[in-house]
Amino acid sequence: MGGSWFLVARFWFPVPSQLPSNNQQPKTSNQKPTSGGAKVRRPALNLNHRRRDLVGRVRFFRKNMMLFKRLLLVVQLAVAGVAAPLAARANHVLIPMDNTQKESLKAYGVAFWLLQREVPVDWLLNYRGGSFAFETVSGAENEMAVRGVTFTVISEAQYTGILQEIADPNANMDVMKLEKVPKIAVYTPKGKQPWDDAVTMVLGYAEIPYTQIYDDEVLKGELPKYDWLHLHHEDFTGEYGKFYATYRNAPWYQQQQHDAEATAKRNGFAKVSVMKGTVATKMQEFIAGGGFLFAMCSATDSYDIALAGLGVDMVESMYDGDPADPAAQSKLNFNRCLAFQNFQLERNPFQYEYSNIDMQPNERGLGEQNDYFSLFTYSAKYDPVPTMLCQNHEKTIHGFMGQTTAFRKSLIKSDVVVMGETKQTGEARYVHGTLGKGTWTFYGGHDPEDYQHLVGEEPTDLALHPNSPGYRLILNNILFPAAKKKKQKT
């Protein structure tokens, strides 16, 4: 381009060798001076010179007219080449979340990465599986490439077209602006447990940072520091997962009991069950103050059981040193529960079950080959919360077992939103509700990509399941607090 402008300059301002110079001496007449000192007739030098100068310039212009036309064409093409990208500048990035995405789970990590850098992210609800979009920012394309996330760079006009498609009143789609970086806490003991934790695994895989907390931190009142709290394979009844019958002699079980009793004593509690009930209450206060609680597996039903049984001894002697109250069932207060009501406690201390909230295998009649649950479809424009929590590229999710696998629908409170169910067995797998200024979500099962995860098994390798629809539901919940416009009040 620079060379073209140089040629144009040379054309408009020719060098001295190309044109006659005003400083050239005019040719003199061939007439010799006459004798006697007679005056010689002076030629019209100025007029002739100007004529020659004009004729020279005209000849030069004619001679180089073709060059001029060519240069003009070069300039026009160059200007058009610059103007075209400016008119259709690619200034948005679309991360599709449908079946074209190669790394669905890591895509959530990219969204989190952007929020950490104060880059707003548009969550395009129900558009191509719940895609993400954002304005281009330095380093983003490289970050996505490193993580293997599929993305497309699009123009302003293209993105405007997408937004218009979403805004159509007949389209069940909407845009949710993500602006806030959620502060995530995972409630889990410091020591290693003989089972994996789906949430910590997917957080690690997606490269989303979190803080590990447990009973000490909760009792010290540290929950208000966070926006989102996760509970996984936990027992809030103080019965150590009801593993007594099978694992009471296992070193990990004995260590777990020892650590729990030491923590209770350190915090002024005579029994672990009483401490766990207090911890559950603190978490309920966290929700009511504006927090987001997400629980899986046994942390779902055991949590509500602990709340219902506050002040009631539901625990037998092998767990707390004294017999349970025979009238414990009649003393339960279901009004304190988040999700369940009218359930019956499992009073047998050797039975690996807490209550009849969890559907039993013989009742379900399902196995790995036919265990599926369906996600509900909500109005994106009018029910954005459950819509966000159900974003997925699949609407039918393969089931997976856990200590608590599925919730008996007849025991779920009427104000609870059932987002995923297996209708033929009368069970819910994925439920949601509100309390005060906050919300909670319960998700049945232990590991979405390990149908029957057993104690002592190796953790799941999520690199083998980068587009797991079951794990996507977990990550929907993690991004959900980012859509909260107002600062959390606790």
Q: Whereabouts are the PLM-identified features?
A:
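Short, Lys/Arg-enriched N-terminal segments with co-localized hydrophobic residues
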Residues: R52-M65
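Helical hinge/lid and interdomain linker segments adjacent to catalytic or ligand-binding clefts
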Residues: H92-V93, D98, K102, F132-N142, ...
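Catalytic beta-strand/loop cores that center a nucleophilic Ser/Cys/Thr
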Residues: D197, G204, D301, D320, ...
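Short, basic, low-complexity termini and linkers enriched in Ser/Thr/Gly/Pro
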Residues: M1-T34, V40-N46
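Catalytic cores of eukaryotic secretory-pathway lumenal/extracellular enzymes that build
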Residues: G268, A308, S317-Y319, P326-S330
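Extracellular ligand-binding/catalytic regions of CAZymes and related secreted enzymes
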Residues: N91-A133, D313, K409-T490
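Bacterial N-terminal signal peptides
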Residues: K69-A83
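Hydrophobic targeting/anchoring helices
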Residues: L86-D197, A206, G445, Q452, ...
